[in-house]
Amino acid sequence: MNYAKFIDHTLLKPESTRQQIDQIIDEAKEYNFKSICVNPTHVKYAAERLNDSGVLVCTVIGFPLGATTTATKIFETEDAIKNGATEIDMVINIGALKDGRFEDVQKDIEGVVGAANGKTVKVIIETVLLSDEEKVKASELAKAAGADFVKTSTGFAGGGATPEDVKLMKDTVGDELEVKASGGVRSLEDFNKMIDAGATRIGASAGVQIIQGLESDSDY
């Protein structure tokens, strides 16, 4: 198993500097991660630096609250792709989900999927804010809207991925969608728990530590 290809090497802190972006780009090239995930303001620079590297550029839409309008999310998506993004991680309208306005939630996702024009779309449902029933419904809506992944968390809402949530989401979407676990995945042990639960992508700022943990474990 190529562990690095499961990892979206992530830096989404609002205070991220160009120097820090350079660091994760260099690490992504060195370890051959699947992608780097950065805020939209860094996409164009990252895409230029990662050109022909094999490392994808992922960005976030409606992040971290999911509370912007669908039109805004569509514009953000189109702008990100124009700047070189190849994967889109969007946040659902969490309040609409809790209201039971499921059509609004699905249309919001569909808007981003349409704007992405074939690029990979991962739908962040923010599991820490949801009941199990809501997690299932959100996953079903992501599936119905034509997304590629359902994703656990932004990492900004006070909780992250759990193996239990990953399994619930995977059981809901089956083989039609993949599951991305993000938020709090900091070690090889965490990584393995998420993969065992059904995740096929891991969003982590600790990608290097995870891979180094793998390397150190392989010495025994």
From Swiss-Prot:
Keywords: Cytoplasm, Lyase, Schiff base. It catalyses: 2-deoxy-D-ribose 5-phosphate = D-glyceraldehyde 3-phosphate + acetaldehyde. One of its GO terms (biological process) is 2-deoxyribose 1-phosphate catabolic process. Coiled coil: none annotated. Catalyzes a reversible aldol reaction between acetaldehyde and D-glyceraldehyde 3-phosphate to generate 2-deoxy-D-ribose 5-phosphate. PANTHER family: DEOXYRIBOSE-PHOSPHATE ALDOLASE (PTHR10889:SF1). This is Deoxyribose-phosphate aldolase. It comes from Staphylococcus haemolyticus (strain JCSC1435).
